[in-house]
Curated annotation (Swiss-Prot):
Gene3D superfamilies in alphabetical order: YqgF/RNase H-like domain
HAMAP family per the UniProt record, alphabetical: Nuclease_YqgF
The protein's name: Putative pre-16S rRNA nuclease
EC code: 3.1.-.-
Function: Could be a nuclease involved in processing of the 5'-end of pre-16S rRNA.
GO MF assignments: nuclease activity
């Protein structure tokens, strides 16, 4: 493969960012970008810097689904964000089911002894790691 993939956990106020290694085997946290989706501030200025730095071949967005698998308003917002992202940066966009990733991220931080006030700073980028890692695992090359 030898190309990176960015993983994004898109919310209404933040975007958690993760990146794969060059082999597409592991995901690492990058940062959390503050956005204001209602005001149309999508964090694309900062994403442009990260895209230039990491040169990803693709971006994977978390797709929030209901527990029964149906897509709701948040999934529609994620797909809209993905369309805008693809148009802005001419990158392939893929989607990964993100059910329970934020809960998993919070559990990891709690188990790691991270204080409540510090968890908020890390939860979105850790959720982005889980989204991207799930995608990488599902699309791993079979050797």
């Amino acid at each position: 493969m030898f190309a990176r993939i960015l993983g994004l956990d898109v919310g209404t106020k933040t975007v958690g960012v993760s990146v794969s290694d060059l082999l597409g085997m592991t995901a690492q946290p990058v940062e959390t970008i503050k956005i204001d989706s209602e005001a149309g501030e999508l964090g694309f200025d900062r994403l442009a810097v990260l895209i230039k730095e990491y040169k990803p071949e693709k971006v994977v967005l978390g797709l929030p689904k209901h527990m029964n698998g149906d897509e709701g308003i948040r999934a529609e917002a994620s797909r809209d964000y993905g369309t805008k992202l693809a148009n802005e940066f001419s990158l392939e966009v893929a989607y990964q089911d993100e059910r329970l990733t934020t809960a998993q991220a919070e559990k990891v931080l709690i188990d790691g002894g991270v204080r409540r006030k510090d968890r908020k700073k890390s939860i979105d980028k850790l959720a982005a790691v889980l989204i991207l890692q799930n995608y990488l695992d599902a699309h791993a090359l079979k050797l």
